[in-house]
């Protein structure tokens, strides 16, 4: 992960757009699964497990420990979301012709599995997927526990 990110050119990154995309992706990737779990009247630990869906498994397990979510369920949710995201990405992204955009989408939505698939599409797609996954992991790992633990 570090080598492709070190080789990436950062001078042409649209920073404002990327920050907006990152914030929207992170918040929606947490809020939508949590909201669905809440609407289905699932238990609080299960809802907390769904909150970790936004990040890759190692980061999700650390967040889950802070949120007291069941670790096995977190692992299942995160890995399944990555597999499903990678499986449906060719269909969902078929009209996206910008390698940077499709890579970022794969990294944000399908984590490590999506990043591996992005590398099969090409080095630019893979770099942006790795960048999206890494930055989203750091961002979500910081705001999510603070937000959840500050709720009454």
Q: Where do the model's predicted regions map?
A:
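Membrane-helix interface "capping/anchor" motifs
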Residues: 10-11, 96-98
